[in-house]
Design a protein with these regions (language model features):
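Active-site core of glycosidic bond-cleaving carbohydrate-active enzymes
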Residues: 1-55, 171-175
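Surface-exposed beta-strand edges and their flanking turn/coil or helix-capping segments
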Residues: 8-11, 60-62, 109-116
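General secondary-structure edge motif
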Residues: 27, 61-62, 150
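Aromatic/acidic polysaccharide-binding cleft in carbohydrate-active enzymes
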Residues: 44-72
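C-terminal non-catalytic alpha-helical accessory regions
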Residues: 51-56, 71-217
């Protein structure tokens, strides 16, 4: 699944998410897949799916399920995936969490307060997951995305604040002089690196990336 430079890019994705996730990323998108599949379903008979990795595992499963019966609701297809690959205990919450991840990529990042709610949903599942589930890449990948989105969201808010204060410092040049204003501006901009935010989320992302890498074998 490619979120840009593709036939069906992610619609309305904000620039910081697109730049940090990259073209090929963990991108479960059942609502979009349902729309695209059914839009063209009458023009062919079935399909062949392929993958450049496991990042789009759910989307492949979903698409083939729609080939089997295009009238199946998107939520039902994801629930079938969750019940089979994750287990019945978490299936309903996993399904809701997948759709929440898809919504994380819609619209201006700074205004998407649902990202924190999405993380809490996945953290609740993480707390209840058994050892086997916590070694299951099909669970770990969307869990990782929830942490990743929350990290980028907090970092983006922080860096927007840094940028705003840097502009304010530049506006002081007529009063303070250009050299002093520039020095102050550089110092403020440096806060993005000197005072990074949400490091606990970043560390959890790194742990989950490592786990996915090893559990995929």
């Amino acid at each position: 699944t490619h979120i840009y430079s593709s036939q069906y890019p992610a619609r309305s994705i904000d620039l910081p998410m697109a730049m940090t996730l990259g073209r090929i990323c963990i991108n479960p998108s059942p609502a979009a897949q349902k729309h695209i599949h059914n839009l063209y379903a009458g023009l062919g008979v079935g399909s062949l799916t392929y993958s450049e990795g496991t990042n789009d595992d759910l989307n492949k499963f979903f698409w083939l399920g729609q080939d089997w019966d295009a009238s199946t609701e998107a939520e039902a297809s994801v629930f079938d995936y969750a019940r089979y690959f994750i287990g019945p205990d978490l299936a309903a919450d996993f399904t809701a969490g997948i759709f929440a991840l898809e919504r994380n990529l819609i619209g201006p990042l700074a205004e998407n307060e649902e990202i924190d709610t999405t993380l809490k949903m996945w953290q609740s599942m993480e707390e209840r997951a058994d050892d086997a589930t916590m070694r299951n890449p099909r669970f770990l990948m969307p869990l990782l995305r929830a942490y990743y989105d929350a990290y980028i969201y907090r970092r983006w808010l922080h860096e927007l604040d840094v940028e705003s204060r840097a502009y304010d410092a530049l506006k002081e040049a007529p009063k303070r002089g250009s050299s002093r204003a520039l020095s102050r501006t550089r110092a403020i901009l440096g806060e993005a690196r000197r005072k990074p935010v949400a490091q606990e989320l970043k560390r959890r992302c790194e742990e989950l990336y490592e786990a996915v890498y090893h559990d995929e074998g």
